[in-house]
């Protein structure tokens, strides 16, 4: 029996001399140094027993061999300490990791993989592109090892979007190469009957979106007690209100002994918002918390007007990114060179986007359709994706962009999370994100794996409060216009205007295209209506950010040329821009009721009313302005982050704490206050013994941005605050989900003329038939439609095995098939043979032939059994004779006209 390999694998400096004690064994499987690799003849010929010099020479030779470079060892690699080899992974998995191109684990992988292998619940956060997917896939494959003969799924990976689930499936397939693990993908839009077969085939790993997985669980009455490994990818998105009902039902069915893992690029420090996940003594790994975006990312924020957004977008594409018009080079040539003998699917391509590849993020799907058609009309190669698009169309559009067939991908936030597109150069935020963490996920699509990338954001005047929220969240310096020479686009938030001449030219072309294309004009009208609804429903910015945004928009730097275009600014051009800014911001001193009152010296009744109203309003405004000036004079040195948080008591305590804490330098960037202004309030606090209820380095803007339920909302929102302080003691077991009150809320229904529960409006069941799930949450009644029973009868399958039961050959789960990457389907169409009148089934066969002739299948494809549709001379002659016989037989005269 071969000797078991050491676990963990010995590091570089360790010597294994036991290999020489067993000359009959080989260490190739265990990774040791075999005896055949080196020449020991001169050393070991007739060794004298008990000779210490021989032993020392042998050990010295072994050490010298182990310290050789990997290039000198043919077919071997030197195992380095601290790498994947030191984690105790099996050989197949190490080969898959090497084949993938990974040599050294990333920080999140180095921290998370050992904790996961120790069966600890984990909450992991690291910036985008840091290898979070591999951080939970590698230990999952290490723990599962091989396919289990007992029925039941053992690992579940939940993803918020279909594209992210497909990408996770590709990673799992690459790392599980060399094993017999079965992995399935369950997303919406695919055939439900095929997914019945996937789940009946006893898969080991299930990668699914919450909605479709819940549908299959209810329809098939799945038992999830065998699941031992659960991953919530992009957990902050999954635990938002959109997936509340699905996750509540799924979590209720999972066993309490499972291992739960939560991963995302934006997670709060407090785990209270993930209480529903059922974490047991979790470990929190937050890496790069102070650096939310990649250091290789350069960002530019352009101040634009609402009517010039389309022209500004075209200016960025043409003049800044220099996007070529038309299809990318080489696309047509590659398609013509494709061989018919060797076919490759979508997964078999190399996936090489062009150096101009750009993603444009918009607010709604109506904006996606509108911009996609506009850019196609402008001559660009465009793909588009949004949530309600057909699944097949989504895959085709994304693959076209991955393979470089298109240069632009217009999407909603459905593609903002987790989608890894190699060599993506640019990200454009056409609609500014309403939450800081959404911006982090959007720009995280570029500047990945050490590559450089750019992000461009269009900021209107109404988006300025969200820009300030983002600046506070990132903790970067705000640079407006030309106030700073040579600003850092990766370290600062640089805001400025675009060049007027190119923008005006593109705006004119856009207005012309609206008159020429009725489709674009109609789509623009729909997008405008959708934007109005979007603005009413998006999260509100912080109140202090809204106040500061007025000063920011009114400043001179808001309309100055962006530093991205250089410092050489024409004086006349700048004067023209300033004049246009003054005209656009002009506010008359008189109202319409007072026009002409000074020249005519006569006062009308309306002018007199406005005069009396102005007497009352003017002193009040002067008092408010004086109070604001006094406040600014007191705290001139207060940075923007402290001003934004000055309205909450928590942040005041934090700022006072920063006065007494001189050692925490990293927190000074975020919360600093003037000690002279609050000296009277802080005298009673002893810096040695005073203990605050918040951490010293607490950043309220950051935690508010990371929040799952709040997102970027104002903490003074009454609904959120009321939910936090509500305590109900009755019927607490019937609560829908965590943190929601259980008392019934009713509303008057005009149609039924009675009070009905408001829950129907909130959970989407209004006007739809709902049923209660096992956890008490309402789910759609269509989840129990009986389609699984019909599928079993159609496939002649009996009852599925119970969880833990041994799967025997010939059973239902053994007969079902799993997707194997390449699916072969019979696509040949052949017509049946002509019916033989001497057979018993002549009529049936004749009917089949007639159906094939009618559908033009096989040899009937070109017509009635002939190769051409036109009749020949003999066919026409025979048809005339037959027609004449019928006329004579009928013996009726023809009708006279």
UniProtKB/Swiss-Prot annotation:
SMART domains: DBP10CT (SM01123), DEXDc (SM00487), HELICc (SM00490). It is found in: Nucleus, Nucleolus. Keywords: ATP-binding, Helicase, Hydrolase, Nucleotide-binding, Nucleus, Ribosome biogenesis, RNA-binding, rRNA processing. One of its GO terms (biological process) is rRNA processing. Residues 886-897 have a biased composition (Basic residues). ATP binds at residues 126-133. It holds the Pfam family DEAD. A motif (DEAD box) lies at residues 233-236. SUPFAM superfamilies: P-loop containing nucleoside triphosphate hydrolases. Residues 756-766, 829-838, 851-885 have a biased composition (Basic and acidic residues). Residues 1-36, 327-356, 730-770, 800-838, 851-897 are annotated as: Disordered. GO terms for cellular component: cytosol; nucleolus. It catalyses: ATP + H2O = ADP + phosphate + H(+). One of its GO terms (molecular function) is RNA binding. The keyword Hydrolase applies. Residues 113-285 form the Helicase ATP-binding domain. Its EC number is 3.6.4.13. A motif (Q motif) lies at residues 82-110. InterPro entries: DBP10_C, DDX54/DBP10_DEAD-box_helicase, DEAD/DEAH_box_helicase_dom, DEAD_box_RNA_helicase, Helicase_ATP-bd, Helicase_C-like, P-loop_NTPase, RNA-helicase_DEAD-box_CS. Residues 333-492 form the Helicase C-terminal domain. PROSITE patterns: DEAD_ATP_HELICASE, HELICASE_ATP_BIND_1, HELICASE_CTER, Q_MOTIF. The Q motif is unique to and characteristic of the DEAD box family of RNA helicases and controls ATP binding and hydrolysis. PANTHER family: ATP-DEPENDENT RNA HELICASE RHLE-RELATED (PTHR47959), RNA HELICASE (PTHR47959:SF8). ATP-binding RNA helicase involved in the biogenesis of 60S ribosomal subunits and is required for the normal formation of 25S and 5.8S rRNAs. Belongs to the DEAD box helicase family. DDX54/DBP10 subfamily. This is ATP-dependent RNA helicase DBP10.
């Amino acid at each position: 029996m071969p000797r078991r390999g050491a676990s963990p694998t010995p590091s570089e400096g360790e010597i294994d001399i036991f290999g020489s004690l067993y000359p009959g064994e080989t260490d190739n499987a265990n990774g040791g140094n075999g005896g055949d690799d080196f020449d020991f003849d001169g050393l070991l010929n007739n060794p004298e027993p008990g000779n210490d010099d021989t032993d020392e020479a042998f050990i010295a030779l072994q050490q010298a061999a182990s310290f050789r470079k990997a290039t000198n060892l043919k077919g071997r690699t030197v195992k380095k300490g601290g790498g994947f080899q030191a984690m105790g992974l099996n050989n197949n998995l190490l080969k898959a990791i090497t084949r993938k191109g990974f040599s050294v684990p990333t920080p999140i992988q180095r921290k998370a993989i050992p904790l996961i292998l120790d069966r600890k619940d984990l909450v992991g956060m690291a910036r985008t592109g840091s290898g979070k997917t591999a951080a939970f896939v590698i230990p999952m494959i290490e723990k599962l090892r091989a396919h289990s003969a007992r029925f039941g799924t053992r690992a579940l990976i939940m993803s918020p979007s279909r594209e992210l689930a497909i990408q996770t499936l590709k990673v799992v397939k690459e790392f599980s190469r060399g094993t017999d693990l079965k992995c399935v993908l369950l997303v919406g839009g695919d055939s439900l009957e095929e997914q019945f077969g996937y789940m009946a085939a006893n898969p080991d790993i299930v990668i699914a979106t919450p909605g479709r997985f819940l549908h299959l669980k209810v329809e098939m009455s799945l038992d999830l007690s065998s699941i031992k490994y659960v991953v919530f990818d992009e957990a902050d998105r999954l635990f938002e209100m959109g997936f509340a009902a699905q996750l509540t039902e799924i979590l209720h069915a999972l066993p309490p002994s499972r291992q739960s893992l939560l991963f995302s690029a934006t997670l709060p420090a407090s785990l209270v918002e993930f209480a529903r996940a059922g974490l047991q003594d979790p470990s929190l790994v937050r890496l790069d918390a102070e650096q939310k975006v990649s250091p290789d990312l350069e960002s530019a924020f352009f101040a634009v007007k609402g009517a010039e957004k389309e022209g500004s977008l075209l200016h960025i594409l043409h003049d800044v990114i220099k996007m070529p018009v038309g299809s990318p080079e080489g696309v047509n040539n590659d398609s013509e060179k494709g061989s018919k003998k060797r076919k490759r699917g979508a997964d078999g391509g190399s996936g090489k986007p062009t150096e101009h590849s750009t993603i444009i993020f918009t607010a709604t799907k109506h904006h996606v359709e509108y911009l996609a058609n506009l850019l196609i009309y402008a001559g660009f190669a465009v793909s588009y994706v949004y949530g309600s698009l057909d699944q097949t169309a989504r895959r085709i559009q994304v693959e076209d962009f991955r393979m470089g067939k298109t240069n632009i991908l217009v999407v909603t936030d459905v593609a903002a999370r987790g989608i890894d597109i190699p060599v993506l150069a640019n990200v454009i935020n056409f609609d500014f994100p309403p939450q800081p963490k959404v911006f982090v996920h959007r720009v995280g699509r570029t500047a990945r794996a050490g590559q450089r990338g750019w992000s461009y954001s269009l900021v209107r005047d109404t988006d300025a409060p969200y820009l300030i929220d983002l600046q506070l969240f990132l903790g970067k310096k705000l640079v407006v216009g030309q106030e700073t020479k040579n600003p850092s686009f990766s370290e600062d938030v640089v805001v400025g205007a675009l060049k007027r001449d190119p923008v005006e030219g593109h705006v004119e072309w856009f207005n012309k295209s609206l008159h020429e294309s009725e489709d674009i004009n109609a789509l623009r009208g729909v997008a405008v209506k959708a934007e109005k609804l979007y603005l009413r429903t998006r999260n509100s910015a912080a109140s202090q950010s809204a106040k500061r945004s007025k000063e920011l928009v009114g400043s001179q730097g808001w309309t100055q040329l962006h530093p991205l275009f250089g410092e050489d600014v024409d004086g006349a051009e700048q004067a023209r821009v300033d004049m246009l800014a003054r005209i656009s911001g002009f506010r008359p001193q008189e109202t319409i009721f007072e026009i002409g009152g000074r020249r005519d010296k006569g006062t009308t009744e309306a002018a007199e009313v406005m005069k009396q109203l102005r007497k009352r309003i003017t002193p009040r405004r002067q008092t408010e302005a004086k109070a604001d000036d006094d406040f600014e004079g007191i705290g001139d040195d207060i940075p923007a982050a402290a001003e934004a948080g000055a309205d909450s008591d928590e942040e005041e305590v934090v700022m006072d704490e920063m006065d007494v804490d001189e050692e925490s330098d990293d927190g000074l960037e975020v919360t600093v206050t003037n000690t002279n202004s609050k000296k009277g309030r802080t005298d009673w606090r002893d810096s040695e013994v005073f203990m605050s209820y918040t951490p010293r380095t607490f950043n309220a803007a950051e935690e508010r941005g990371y929040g799952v339920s709040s997102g970027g909302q104002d903490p003074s929102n009454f609904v959120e605050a009321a939910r936090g302080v509500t305590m109900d003691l009755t019927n607490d077991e019937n609560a829908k989900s965590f943190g929601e009150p259980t008392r019934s809320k009713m509303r008057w229904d005009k149609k039924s003329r009675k009070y009905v529960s408001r829950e129907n409006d909130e959970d989407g069941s209004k006007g739809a038939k709902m049923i209660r799930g096992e956890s008490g949450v309402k789910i759609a009644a269509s989840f129990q439609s009986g389609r699984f029973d019909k599928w079993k009868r159609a496939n002649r399958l009996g009852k599925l095995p119970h969880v833990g039961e041994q799967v025997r050959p010939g059973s239902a789960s053994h007969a079902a098939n799993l997707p194997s990457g390449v699916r072969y389907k019979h696509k040949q169409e052949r017509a049946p043979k002509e019916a033989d009148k001497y057979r018993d089934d002549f009529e049936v066969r004749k009917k089949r032939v007639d159906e094939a002739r009618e559908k033009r299948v096989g040899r009937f494809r070109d017509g009635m059994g002939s190769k051409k549709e036109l009749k020949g001379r003999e066919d026409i002659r025979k048809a005339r004779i037959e027609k004449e016989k019928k006329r004579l037989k009928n013996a009726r005269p023809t009708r006279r006209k």
